[in-house]
Each structure stands twice: as structure tokens, then as C-alpha cells.
Amino acid sequence: MLNLNELKSGFHYFVMGWHFITQKGLRRFVIMPIVLNTVLLCGLFWLFISQISSAIDWVMNFIPDWLSFLSVILLILSILTILLLFYFTFTTISGFIAAPFNGLLAEKVEKMLTGENINDDGLVDIMRDVPRMLAREWQKLRYSLPKIIALFLLSFIPLVGQTIVPVLTFLFTCWMMAIQYCDYPFDNHKVSFDIMKNVLGNQRTQSLTFGGLVTCCTFVPVINLLIMPVAVCGATLMWVENYRNDLGFNMNKSFSSQTGLDVRSENTGIVK
């Protein structure tokens, strides 16, 4: 069920992400994710342009003749599915490459918001954390890949593959974007992937709204070059206002997806 308060807060965190990337103390930590984003997007854009015609022809071959009168609509939906699959490829690759930089950016944003250091690790300790960060990215890939494969197989079913699958793919992409970027502040505090997934699911409207805005902006030229650090900053603010007190400093507290959490935003006073 749609929660209007969560819808509003999801939009708020996305907008605030744009505000944070302009802050003087964060600019140098924003540059590297932007550079990586630019290189990856250029490479995948070239790949997309070179393969889009063949991909469309392949998908359209599954449309039966008796649905030819809907060919224009089905063509648009097929292109949307292909775009989302390319987008999933982009976020997967960028997640592995940019994980250390995004984790550091999330740490600096949290320090700016709270005035507290997450840890006092030196450069050597940070480098030792890189394998753990990459393992976390692999965990996200293991979670998402079976679902992407299932959606891909469903796309072979006539009509279903060109109507329902694009919608399901978009919703799943929104959910994965929330997981992808919220994971950086969660992981900085060693919060497990399953706990993170469950608490984000308890506020699903907020998560899908935030992830949906990130997804849509990825397809907008110029804006898509900045979206990675924007999403990290917005997700970190979401962590601080919604989850930090419950999870970051009270890890002995057991969590149950059946019971949930009473999560409040300190700034708004809204129970989400």
C-alpha cells in the first residue's frame, strides 16, 4: 500500500543528495565517483548504440502476428526492457569498481551530519576493508542475478514479455537502486546485508521512490554523470535519519522482519 509520508521522504532524500555534493568539505570525495561514472557510462552507451538494433529485432521476433497492431506500443516496452537490462549491467560493474570511493563518501557525509567519526582507521586499514566491500557487492549480485534471469526468461513469453515484464523490471530496478546506494552507509557500520534489506523493505514506498528517482535520472544526459555521488549522499542522509540509532549503535538488538522497527525521522518527526 502506498504511504504518502514515505513517498515524500523518498523524494526529500533524493533532492538533498544534490545539495550535499555541492558542499565544500565533500567536493573532493565526489570527484572520483563522477569520473568513474563518466567512463563507465560512455563505454556502455557505445555498447548500447552498437547493439540496440539487433536486440530490438530479437525481442520483436517473439511477438505473434495477431498482435501486430500493437507493434508500436510493444516496441516501446521492449526498448524499455533492454534499457533496464543495460542499466543493471552498468550498476553492477560500477558497484564493484566504485565501492571503496562510495563507502568513503558515505563516511564523510555521515561525519558532516553527526559530527562523529565512524572509525579512526588509517589508509592501510581502509585498504584492508576493500575485500570486504567487494564481497558485499558480490552478495548484492547473488541476490539480484536470479531475479534478473527470471525476468529475462519471462520476456520470452509472448505478450507477457512485452507488457508485464517491463513494469516488473522497472520496479525491481528501483528496489535494487535503493539497496545499492543505501548499502554504503549500512556497510560502513558492518550492518549485515539481510538486516539492511529487511529494514528497507519495512519502508518500501520510501525505498522505491528514492530508487525510482535514481533510476530515471540515470537515463538523463549530463545528470547521469552526477547521479552516483548524489545517490550515495541521499542514501546516507536516509541512514542517519531513519536507521542509524536503531542499527548503527545497537547491534546487539535482535531484528525480526516479522516484528519490524519503530523507525522515526528526527528532523521531521514522521513515523515511517
Curated annotation (Swiss-Prot):
Biological process (GO), any one: sulfate assimilation
A family per Pfam: EI24
Main function: High affinity, high specificity proton-dependent sulfate transporter, which mediates sulfate uptake. Provides the sulfur source for the cysteine synthesis pathway.
Name of this chain's protein: Sulfate transporter CysZ
Disulfide bond positions: none
InterPro entries: CysZ_sulfate_transptr, Sulfate_CysZ
Localization per record: Cell inner membrane
GO cellular component: plasma membrane
Family: Belongs to the CysZ family.
Gene Ontology molecular functions: high-affinity sulfate:proton symporter activity
Organism per entry: Haemophilus influenzae (strain ATCC 51907 / DSM 11121 / KW20 / Rd)
Lipid bilayer topology: Multi-pass membrane protein
Lineage top rank: taxon: Bacteria
